[in-house]
């Protein structure tokens, strides 16, 4: 039909009919293509390019940076132990000691955020069990965490040697002193017996009985950090006062030397931990902290008056047992621990290597008491606070929070 010069179609022209019939097909095809590509993109892409290895916080190097942020605490922290409070004791070079920053290979290590950490740990508890190096570790931890809760109070319940309660977060962090982990006690001998062979008495070690200080408290903690090592030497238990090992209440025959005795104690303590400590508890074993005595042991005028960290190529000379140096025991002890823990779920806290460098960071002669060095010698075993244990805390906090996120 035509109106004037305009043509009006009462039916759709063939060209329009054909194009309109194609439109749904095009839309359908487009949707199918989008679906296809979305599925392709969701599939993992295989490649022969190796993915980067997981971050190893324990391998790296110390980097000096005068702009490194100052420690989170100072000499006024109420949880200090006097001999390690190197700021109060006016130790030389404390600014320099704390200007070195640990940089792991291939990744970064963030300084602990005390508020975030305690917030994540709300209503949870952290326990340290072992010798005074775990106490050294704990004191650093307490002073750092107190930044987030200045109302923290000292806590010595449940046979804890030292600790703190953080009421703002309902968190307890404490240390239980158990230097051998196993139960041990002094057994004196009569004067007549001592005169015969020179042995004044013995220390009985029950290899299968945990020390009273921690045997019944592990269920209280959500995180536990164990260690033992520094007492397993002849400087602590010389031939005049040796260790004698017992099992099931009876002396072990033939008698064991110190390191085989340590190995047997370790086997029994690890077995107890796996059997008795709740499976949900996050368990760490801190490897040995190295000593840095130079020129003799602690009781032989050994010294550590160094002003910078060791170089990488010096470490084996100081610590490799094959060189029979003064400080060889750490790696020997560590190998025994690694062998025993390799089939367990206890996580290794390998702080040894990073600490081996830091010969410059011990209290040395700055012990806070006038006659301390004359009586005890230099302290080249424990660490100045603030100092290297603050880096241990950074690493431990990172590992704890990582494990909490994956629960």
UniProtKB/Swiss-Prot annotation:
Membrane-spanning parts: 21-41
**UniProt keyword list:** Membrane, Signal-anchor, Transmembrane, Transmembrane helix
Location of the motif DCXHWCLPGXXDXWN motif = 379-393
Pfam families (UniProt xref): PC-Esterase, PMR5N
Q: How does it sit in the membrane?
A: Single-pass type II membrane protein
Write out the residue ranges of the motif GDS motif: 130-132
- Localization annotation: Membrane
Tell me its family. Answer: Belongs to the PC-esterase family. TBL subfamily.
The task this protein performs is described as: May act as a bridging protein that binds pectin and other cell wall polysaccharides. Probably involved in maintaining esterification of pectins. May be involved in the specific O-acetylation of cell wall polymers.
Q: What is this protein called?
A: Protein trichome birefringence-like 12
